[in-house]
């Protein structure tokens, strides 16, 4: 420690600032009031899980808690079925409209096969998550999800979720394929295909 630093550490007098540098509009108690309503710790403050106006707001909590992964009262298999159906249905469109065969007669079938292939890859990743020596990670309650599903975070629950995900994903892609193959969409399919064509 230098002599300059030692003089400050041994000094018992508080440091005085010139009044021209002092902001009188901020009082010492103002910062505590802002901390009380804006950000609170959920459980252990060392973990860093904080309740903010975004993650503990009504809209965010209602949206997250109504997703099939966190909704109360449904089995892990149905959670996987609903999640997989959404993934398969939503993956079909980009694979069909932006895939390498988008301008051919096989675009609709190629999109179906690509979406089912992507669902198979995601299912393999879910199987690998359940394969290591320990059970799946159990999520503790936090500011957004008060009651995470306990039956999902077991080996059997995760296996049920995975099988439901595979079935729902393939079914969602097939459902999207059937919708695109109807006669009602024949008039707008060329318009949609020409949006992403290069050249």
Swiss-Prot record:
It is a multi-pass membrane protein. Pfam families: PsaL. GO terms for cellular component: photosystem I reaction center; plasma membrane-derived thylakoid membrane. This is Photosystem I reaction center subunit XI. Belongs to the PsaL family. It is found in: Cellular thylakoid membrane. The chain crosses the membrane at residues 108-128, 165-185. The lineage of its organism: Bacteria, Bacillati, Cyanobacteriota, Cyanophyceae, Synechococcales. InterPro entries: PSI_PsaL (IPR003757), PSI_PsaL_sf (IPR036592), PSI_suXI (IPR022980). Its main location: membrane. It comes from Prochlorococcus marinus (strain MIT 9515). Keywords: Membrane, Photosynthesis, Photosystem I, Thylakoid, Transmembrane, Transmembrane helix. One of its GO terms (biological process) is photosynthesis.
